[in-house]
Amino acid sequence: MTLLGAAQIRELAAALDLKPSKSLGQNFVIDSNVCTKIVRTAAVGPTDIALEIGPGLGSLTLALLDSAASVVAVEIDSRLAGQLPITVANHFEHPENLTVLNQDALSIQSLPVNPTVLVANLPYNVSVPVLLHLLEKFGSLRTGVVMVQAEVADRLAAKPGTKEYGIPSVKAAWWAEVKGAGSVSRSVFWPAPNVDSKLVSFTRRQTPGDEVLRRKVFTIIDAAFAQRRKMLRSALSGLYGSSSSAEEILKRADIDPTLRGEALEISSFCAIAAVAPDIF
């Protein structure tokens, strides 16, 4: 196995006449050591089926193939999706272990196999929606490590009561425990992004309820953080008709109506949903 370095990445891009697209969030990892670190952090093993989103020119893909049983790579850019199998065949002795899907990760509803681990340099402009979509649709994903913008990583891994805690934190917690997993230098990307990057890891946990409850809980979360400085009785008044109605529901859920959304864990939002009327 030969991993790709900066020179090979630039050569591949030149051969494709590829200019990295800002709209697609294309910042390619050019440091093979970082790719190896990400795969190691994700603890990818020989029985794992790895799901990679936005494989780009294949630097992380090759590192994954070196550790996993197989890799499913989802790439929205048709040029990159077409080149990736060729690149892998030139650098890896078992190219059949790679499946490439030329699709938008946000629209994927099924995969040819059930992935067990997500490892990806997620497009920064859609990283949270993509992560939440994958956690929702693919229950076989037990663990994962993703690279995202530093501020997004902090929000995903934030705990109640912190300034970073918000909608991404609580919604991700419905499916998984999310933790920070280290920083990544801008210098490992081409082109270098204008923002800092971090890794976050997740471990799947038992969800608090079914899909009906999830949609109800997520609606409450959205309302609670729409104006995050408002007390919950005010923030939820739009959902339940008035502040007094919201206060009554909160008291039934054993939640202090004067708290703000940023103080509540996912279990507290579930408690509110359990006693609140349906809002669909």
Predicted regions and their residues:
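Short helix-coil junctions and helix-kink-helix linkers
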Residues: 237-239
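Catalytic cores of RNA-modifying enzymes
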Residues: 1-223, 251, 262, 271-274, ...
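Active-site-proximal catalytic alpha-helix in oxidoreductases
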Residues: 226
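Catalytic core of IPPT-family isopentenyl/dimethylallyl transferases
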Residues: 255-268
